[in-house]
Amino acid sequence: MVYLLISICISSFLFVIFKLFDVLKINTFQAIVVNYFTAAVLGFFLSNNLVSFQEIPDQPWFFGAFLLGIMFILVFNIMALTSQKNGLSVASVSSKMSVVIAIIFGVWYYEESLSLIKLMGIVLALVAVYLTSFKEKNAIVQNNKDFLYPVLLFFGSGAIDTSLKYVETSFVAEGGVPLFSATIFGCAFILGVIVLLYQKIIGSLSFELKSIFGGILLGVPNYFSIVYLLKALSTEGMESSTAFTLNNVGIVILSTLFGLFIFNEKLIRKNWVGISVAVVSILLIMFVNE
């Protein structure tokens, strides 16, 4: 349980860092690219795997890691935009309620059961994402793009969770998770560098030194949030469904508190209802999976 609490705290802190990027005028994409370099280096350095760099492309999970790297950098940027445009609570709920996508995939692909209570949880999660997307009273969102960000984050995060589970269970051998994770971060970094080089060629790139510091600040907790979640999942007696749902509920609540007390974010009644519905939905799903 200690590992899970650490993961919740670190993951919630990621949303705070994204918000600070906006406050300090740090280029979000540049910082995210550096973040993935930092996370990849940490992963390769701390991995005890004897596989050499030359052998990584030959691993059965490499293609999956490459695709996940693309999704990681895309969704991470959407998460940053959602935190900055819609607030911490909207970003956290949109990303963490995407657990319902993994559940639907499990029912379809792994032929897991779908009870009435689980179905209620899925429906309530979708309602929660909608309610927390409201920014002002009596209005959904003044800018349609601002409403689009939470929706993209919801489906993008769900795609990552589902793909991670599929690739890890199908292709990653025991003890290979650190190297697999580091490879995902490395692929995301390479893609980010390609985009930065393109921006340099067309003359739209002005790299800022503070982006490096911002990326390091983001990369270290980003890596360890995954490490401690994996440690929590490997704890004896800790069911994966319980760990994931508790992790999601904790991040939603804690990131909302961060938004309220650190950035003075204002939540209208619909937002509070949405957050409450989110907690109820994920508790229902956890209850079914017990």
Model-inferred region functions:
Residues 19, 80, 106-107, 165, ...:
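Small-residue-mediated transmembrane helix hinge/kink sites in multi-pass secondary transporters
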Residues 157-165, 169, 226-230, 236:
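Extracytoplasmic gate region of multi-pass secondary transporters
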Residues 20, 30, 90, 113-116, ...:
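Residue-level recognition of membrane-helix boundary sites in multi-pass small-molecule transporters
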Residues 1-66, 76-85, 136-153, 186-235, ...:
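Membrane-interface interhelical linkers
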Residues 1-11, 55-72, 111-127, 150, ...:
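Structural signature of hydrophobic alpha-helical transmembrane segments
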Residues 1-5, 100-166, 270, 275-290:
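Juxtamembrane helix-loop boundary signature in multi-pass membrane transporters
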Residues 38-42, 94-108, 123, 187, ...:
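Alpha-helical transmembrane segments of compact multi-pass small-molecule transporters, enriched
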Residues 27, 78-94, 172-178, 229-247:
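Structural motif at transmembrane-helix junctions in multi-pass transporters
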